[in-house]
Amino acid sequence: MKFVDEATILIVAGDGGNGCISFRREKYIPNGGPDGGDGGDGGDVYLLADENLNTLIDYRFEKSFRAERGQNGQSRDCTGKRGKDITIKVPVGTRVLDQGTGEVLGDMTRHQQSLMVGKGGWHGLGNSRFKSSVNRAPRQKTNGTKGEERELTLELLLLADVGMLGLPNAGKSTFIRAVSAAKPKVADYPFTTLVPSLGVVRMDSEQSFVVADIPGLIEGASDGAGLGIRFLKHLERCRVLLHLVDLAPIDESNPIENAKVIINELEQYGAGLAEKPRWLVFNKVDLIDKAEAEKRAKEIAAALGWDDKYYLISAANREGVNPLCWDVMNFLKANPKMMAIAESAPEKVEFMWDDYHREQLAEVEKEAEEEWDDDWDDEDDEGVEIIYQK
């Protein structure tokens, strides 16, 4: 299946149903009073994280999603039916942004996590709500409000523990093939890897971690050159980055400059990638003499100002790979993933008499009071029967 990690969709929540103007009319009850019911609330739009999905390709073809409108109120104080909600399934790891404002609405990082992205409109009030001592036969109602409408940008970020960095042909895909069951394409030309891939590294029956391989970076990637800039976002959730440096580049380029290119692109990209733990791994030591490999690695580390430990490996024949993987496993155990628990603020409980409806009723009552003028003289009141007078 084609890997698609970005999509734009339009979501429209349902409008609220309108209130009804109606009066009770039955045999022997000619003036039964108002009985218009309220409308129904509009349906909401939700996103649901599903671990069985791994691409956003479905939303390249289906781009519009609309929740159901609330039904209008009816006579006999019948309330309209609430509109049905709509649920859109997305892969775990999807980031949701409002395209208009750029606001991050949420990160779908857990299976079955739900996120409301569109609130349905409020129902309108029927004329029975406006009955009062001064307005026995109200002919007012309110219409339902519009549901939320917005364009969303969905970005799929792979959930991996370890991310691979390096120029094209640094040996990233070969490494992930050597340590996991993943089989990304491997060849002797640049940009063999066109899309990210994940591999599970199993150290024993109880310990494992996930490694992500992304297309190689080139100079100017942070400005849009090459393929890597599109996929650097997949490294944002990694706990450690493995920076692979080719000790014997096929194009005879300078490994020191190659390593500096990657470091510079991380700093230019931002999003905290440059501050993440990064390990220096020298690959393809099997292509040169062992002493020469150690000499080159030492020179590169000194030129980069690298004081931490570095590794010499050959991903092709798995030389030095197992100790590296165990060190990664121990690092991950010592630095467990911090699951961000969003402390959701207590939501305002919205009943039928919410602020919107209170304002509507207050306006109508104010108008009715202004129209009602009583001079306390019963003689000029039309339609008033004097029952008793002293």
Curated annotation (Swiss-Prot):
Record-annotated membrane-spanning stretches: none
Major enzyme class: hydrolase
Domain Obg as annotated: residue spans: 1-159
Annotated segments matching region Disordered: 128-147
GO cellular component: cytoplasm
Cofactor: Mg(2+)
Pfam family, one: MMR_HSR1
Keywords: Cytoplasm, GTP-binding, Hydrolase, Magnesium, Metal-binding, Nucleotide-binding
Compartments it resides in: Cytoplasm
Polar residues bias locations: 129-145
EC number: 3.6.5.-
Subunit comment: Monomer.
PANTHER family listed in its UniProt record: DEVELOPMENTALLY REGULATED GTP-BINDING PROTEIN-RELATED (PTHR11702), MITOCHONDRIAL RIBOSOME-ASSOCIATED GTPASE 2 (PTHR11702:SF31)
Cross-referenced HAMAP family: GTPase_Obg (MF_01454)
Descriptive protein name: GTPase Obg
Organism annotation: Pectobacterium atrosepticum (strain SCRI 1043 / ATCC BAA-672) (Erwinia carotovora subsp. atroseptica)
Organismal lineage: Bacteria, Pseudomonadati, Pseudomonadota, Gammaproteobacteria, Enterobacterales
Gene name linked to the record: obg
